[in-house]
Amino acid sequence: MRPISPQALATLLSNAGVTPESASEAMNSGGHVGSGAKQRVDPKLSRTGRGAMSPAELRVAIDKAADAAGIPNDKMVRAKWHALYRFLIEHESGNQPDRIQEVKDVNMSGAQAADGAPANAARGLCMMVPGTFGGHHVAGTSDNIYDPVANIAASMSYVMTKYHVEPNAGSNFDTFEARRHANGYTGY
């Protein structure tokens, strides 16, 4: 390997659109925007009062959640996570952040909570139950289970932990995604 002069390196990086600041940020962040660190919370149950989110609103929310959850900001990686979460959210909640579980199952239990639903009912875009949301809450996001970014980020954290899916969409990502598409849609 031949040494390169500092000026030549600076020119090379500049032509690639890399600044010393962005290179330093990437090196210090491991290539992600957020750390994806979990922060246990007692979820708030405050509905947003909004209807279904538009595709553009979902794209922004998924990107912010991916940033917080430590998903690398790589076009191919983000495209895979976006496709997965657009599909998952459409089937889980119909793109409605205030959705409460309608299917009677083991989660549909507990005393009536502040939002009128049983305490353990699944809520939000990704249909997170409060205990799972609280245990997989991503630091830096809202502690409100109905907040779109917080709900998606907690879901991503849960998927990465429970199903051993790597943030870079490597190990187990394709298997997890294929299982969601089985029979039209299979929940997680």
Region annotations inferred by a language model:
Residues 12, 16-33, 37, 152:
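Composition-driven recognition of long, low-complexity, acid-poor segments enriched in small hydrophobic
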Residues 50-58, 73-80, 117-125, 140-151:
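Extracytoplasmic/periplasmic, Sec-exported soluble proteins
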Residues 31-96:
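Export/targeting segments at the very N-terminus of extracytoplasmic proteins
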Residues 5-9, 19-23, 55-58, 81, ...:
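Short amphipathic alpha-helical segments that mediate assembly, nucleic-acid/protein binding
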